[in-house]
Regions:
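Sequence context surrounding c-type heme c attachment/ligation sites in exported
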Residues: 1-15, 33, 37-41, 45, ...
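Conserved hydrophobic/aromatic "anchor" residues
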Residues: 21-22
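Intrinsically disordered, low-complexity Ser/Thr-rich linker and spacer segments
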Residues: 27-31
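Compositionally biased, charged N-terminal/linker segments
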Residues: 34-77
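N-terminal post-signal-peptidase region of extra-cytosolic proteins
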Residues: 68-84, 108-113
Length: 179
């Protein structure tokens, strides 16, 4: 997903130049793994304590491939801007609870009367938030204005994550405030 967002910004000549450059490089071993780039591993997003009472749930999505159901919440600033059809401003926070779906006897996710999977165990949280200057150290090809992304454990601890994956996935969504 990271390269898809970048590739859409490149011309055929750019792609040929990138391919030529990497063709001259020594290949990595099969087990090699690069460290995250520091400016993509760092996030300014904090766990929004008290979100259950200060944010509003605005969406639910089933994820059949991973047998998950996700509940989406937003703070008042984000909700007001969205309601007014405006870009989400600095101070906006979107937050997600990610649950495994309860399985039926056939192993398929159970669906509730609302059409959504029945939530089982909380797996982790994700968040995206923006403040002025947060995007300044992110390469332009991935930058989503000043949005930063984070994932948290069920204990609310920050999980190490490659923010580039989030940035790349959200990059094409510029007309919708990268959401």
């Amino acid at each position: 997903p990271i390269m898809n967002a970048i590739a859409t910004q490149l011309s055929a000549d750019d792609i040929a130049n990138v391919a030529a450059y990497f063709a001259t490089q020594t290949g990595a071993t099969a087990t090699a793994k690069s460290d995250f780039l520091p400016n993509l591993a760092k996030t300014s997003v904090k766990f929004p304590e008290g979100y259950q009472t200060t944010f509003r749930k605005y969406h639910t999505i089933n994820f059949p491939a991973t047998k998950q159901v996700r509940y989406y919440f937003a703070n008042d600033m984000a909700l007001r801007a969205a309601k007014d059809g405006k870009p989400l401003p600095d101070g906006s926070v979107l937050f997600t609870e990610v649950y495994s779906a309860k399985s039926g006897p056939d192993g398929k996710p159970l669906t509730g009367p609302d059409g959504f999977f029945v939530a089982d165990q909380l797996l982790f949280y994700t968040a995206m938030a923006r403040e002025a200057g947060w995007g300044k150290d992110i390469p332009e090809m991935l930058r989503n204005e000043d949005w930063n992304y984070a994932a948290f454990t069920t204990g609310k601890a920050l999980r190490p994550v490659n923010q580039a994956e989030c940035l790349a996935c959200h990059k094409p969504l510029d007309k919708a405030s990268y959401t």
